[in-house]
């Protein structure tokens, strides 16, 4: 039986992971969970799965949750904040940590888990975007496996299995194009938050959905793929694929291209990561090729959706530049969600921060955390209306 901690259990990835655990309860034990502030959802999860530990990272939610649990006389130990996260990823009786929190909050707990020798099911792309060099070196040192949960990276992971890595010519990351595919820059000037959150294919949290609308999500995935698969940026390509059926592709030196196809259901890549290297019957709907009308592919419009180009630029610069880009994006997306800036302001803010802040080729975890504070403060102070 595999014993698991889930960071971000009340979010989109976390709740879908629970579906897998329910279906396969003989093979999994949920030992610890975390949520930022979703008290009621977490109470239901604790009631159902009876984990040994639960963490909340927002103080009022933590106090409220603790009060509810004391009234219920639950056995679950309740912890708070980053210290709580660092505790539940390093528990001696867990085998794997699913990191499905959004943003840089996932970086330090993931590092703590790796230092403790726990395998990682990685849904927090910021961990590799911001600290990829440190994280991958640490994983090798501690002989820890990192299994990608993003559908695109899971697809690539599956397509390279059993093949010679040296034979890989290109990686193709597919993207739906988001809700604004085909629009001009002028047509995006006054788009609303509601429009940006209307993703055509995937069910995700708000931050990831906005990132998909700007194509920043794909840019972050390019950087993530660079570190996950040790692949030069020149060999990582993005292809717009509106049907979201082909989740990514790998081209080999003989011209052969291997692709992974499935329905748009995140439970499949989550299940593959949790069960690796076994395949089990999945909860997802099967593809029906006889009713599949079209598979189309097109080049991304990086002039209109500039964050994708900026992500490539940041990745190629290296050092702390991806961290600067990521932190600027987190701050800008938050401002957009609260109607403080316009949609196109996001790319302007990213570019300004990349030009303003000095990039360093050598850095520590503490340096990255300092960058987060500095960049986010700058964006908030300068661009909040």
UniProtKB/Swiss-Prot annotation:
GO terms for biological process: isopentenyl diphosphate biosynthetic process, methylerythritol 4-phosphate pathway involved in terpenoid biosynthetic process. Mn(2+) binds at residues 150, 152, 221. NADPH binds at residues 10-13, 124, 126, 205. Pathway: Isoprenoid biosynthesis; isopentenyl diphosphate biosynthesis via DXP pathway; isopentenyl diphosphate from 1-deoxy-D-xylulose 5-phosphate: step 1/6. Its EC number is 1.1.1.267. One of its GO terms (molecular function) is 1-deoxy-D-xylulose-5-phosphate reductoisomerase activity. It catalyses: 2-C-methyl-D-erythritol 4-phosphate + NADP(+) = 1-deoxy-D-xylulose 5-phosphate + NADPH + H(+). InterPro entries: DXP_reductoisomerase, DXP_reductoisomerase_C, DXP_reductoisomerase_N, DXPR_C, DXPR_C_sf, NAD(P)-bd_dom_sf. Its cofactor is Mg(2+); Mn(2+). 1-deoxy-D-xylulose 5-phosphate binds at residues 125, 151-152, 176, 199, 212, 217-218, 221. It is an enzyme of class 1 (oxidoreductase). Keywords: Isoprene biosynthesis, Manganese, Metal-binding, NADP, Oxidoreductase. PANTHER family: 1-DEOXY-D-XYLULOSE 5-PHOSPHATE REDUCTOISOMERASE, 1-DEOXY-D-XYLULOSE 5-PHOSPHATE REDUCTOISOMERASE, CHLOROPLASTIC. HAMAP family: DXP_reductoisom. Catalyzes the NADPH-dependent rearrangement and reduction of 1-deoxy-D-xylulose-5-phosphate (DXP) to 2-C-methyl-D-erythritol 4-phosphate (MEP). Belongs to the DXR family. This is 1-deoxy-D-xylulose 5-phosphate reductoisomerase. It comes from Clostridium kluyveri (strain ATCC 8527 / DSM 555 / NBRC 12016 / NCIMB 10680 / K1). The gene is dxr.
């Amino acid at each position: 039986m595999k014993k698991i901690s889930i960071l971000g259990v009340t979010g989109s990835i976390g709740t879908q992971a629970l579906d897998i655990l329910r279906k396969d309860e003989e093979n999994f034990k949920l030992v610890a969970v975390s949520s930022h502030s979703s008290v009621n959802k977490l109470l239901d999860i604790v009631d159902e799965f009876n984990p040994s530990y639960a963490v909340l990272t927002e103080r009022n939610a933590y106090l409220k949750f603790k009060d509810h649990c004391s009234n219920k006389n639950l056995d679950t130990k309740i912890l708070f904040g980053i210290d709580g996260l660092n505790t539940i990823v390093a528990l001696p009786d867990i085998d794997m940590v699913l990191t499905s929190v959004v943003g840089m909050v996932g970086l330090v707990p993931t590092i703590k888990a790796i230092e403790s020798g726990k395998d990682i099911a990685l849904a927090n792309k910021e961990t590799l975007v911001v600290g990829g060099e440190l994280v991958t070196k640490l994983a090798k040192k501690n002989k820890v496996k990192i299994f990608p949960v993003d559908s695109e990276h899971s697809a690539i992971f599956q397509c390279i299995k059993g093949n010679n890595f040296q034979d890989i010519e290109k990686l193709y990351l597919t993207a739906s194009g988001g809700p604004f595919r085909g629009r001009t820059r002028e047509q995006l000037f006054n788009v609303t938050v509601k429009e940006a959150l209307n993703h055509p294919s995937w069910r995700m949290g708000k931050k990831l959905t906005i990132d998909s609308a700007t194509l920043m999500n794909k840019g972050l995935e390019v950087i993530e793929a660079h570190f996950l698969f040790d692949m030069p940026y020149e060999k990582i390509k993005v292809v717009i694929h509106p049907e979201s059926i082909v989740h990514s592709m790998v081209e080999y030196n003989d011209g052969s291209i291997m692709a992974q196809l499935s329905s748009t259901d995140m439970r499949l890549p989550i299940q593959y990561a949790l069960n690796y290297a076994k395949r089990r019957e999945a909860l997802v709907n099967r593809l029906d090729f006889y009713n599949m009308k079209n598979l189309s592919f097109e080049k991304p419009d990086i002039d209109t959706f500039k964050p994708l180009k900026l992500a490539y630029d940041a990745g190629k610069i290296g050092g702390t530049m991806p961290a600067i880009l990521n932190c600027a994006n987190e701050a800008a997306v938050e401002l957009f969600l609260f109607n403080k800036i316009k949609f196109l302001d996001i790319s302007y803010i990213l570019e300004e921060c990349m030009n303003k802040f000095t990039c360093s080729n050598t850095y520590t975890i503490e340096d990255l955390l300092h960058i987060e504070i500095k960049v986010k403060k700058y964006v908030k102070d300068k661009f909040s209306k």
